[in-house]
Amino acid sequence: MRRILIVVLLLAVIAASVGFIILKTQSLSDDQNFFNRNFRSKFAANEFWRAIFGLQSSGDARADYLGSRYKKVLIEVDIMQGLSAQISGLDALKDKIQKITGKPTDYIISDRAVRYYRDLDTELIDDLVDQYQIRETSGDTALIYLLYASRSQEDAGFLGLTHREYGIVLFEETLKEFSREDPGILANYEVSTALHEFGHQLGLDHNDRPGCLMNEEVEIGRFWERPEDVILDFCEFELQQLGFNR
């Protein structure tokens, strides 16, 4: 009897291990596989399981921002040497994130300048974030990490992108080119691009709807001539996707 029990336990351990390996492998894929369709959002809502399965893609920290566990949001801002952030843009971004999350939101600008690189690929961005990021989601505060960087090596037209499940990268030199150095348009471009990337961190995908913030044109840039023409809020369709019935 004892031998049978040991065999059963060993088989259970083996089955559990194999199951974990299969799910772990699927969790690392961007495909709409069984795990991602049925379990990813559930596991990602819990920090422990998020760490176990290595869930660090856009949208995996959605529950941190929209759930009830964290009561505040903090934006940690790092700026590459030679670049600058529009304070009016940061103030507006803070207010808009506070409105969408329903949580008091603030930002803090690091006093350390990030080493300048002319072009950035994903690997270099990872290295810079690992080197310069100080804070993390903890206590009652969910973190958003915002990096003002130079430009994308992979696509010179990219205005911004997401980093892991909590970060936003703004390509400031590209934003300045698209805004033609107009401070009013530049600040709104920064807000629009950052909020678009935050939408991805809330789990929103691109759409092709005119006037919607998650329209892919916001990410790759388009020439708005006036500050008031820049899209600065989620549209009704996107709010419904986030669970806001208005």
Label the predicted regions:
Residues 74-76, 145, 167-169, 212-213:
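Generic structural signal for residues positioned in beta-strands
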Residues 64-66, 135, 203:
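Residues embedded in well-ordered secondary-structure elements
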Residues 33-39, 71, 142, 164-166, ...:
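Residues that flank catalytic or metal-binding motifs in active/ligand-binding sites
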Residues 77-81, 174, 218:
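Short, histidine-centered active-site or binding-site loop motifs used for metal coordination
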Residues 1-117:
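N-terminal low-structure segments adjacent to metalloprotease catalytic domains
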Residues 87-193:
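Metzincin-family zinc-dependent endopeptidase catalytic domain
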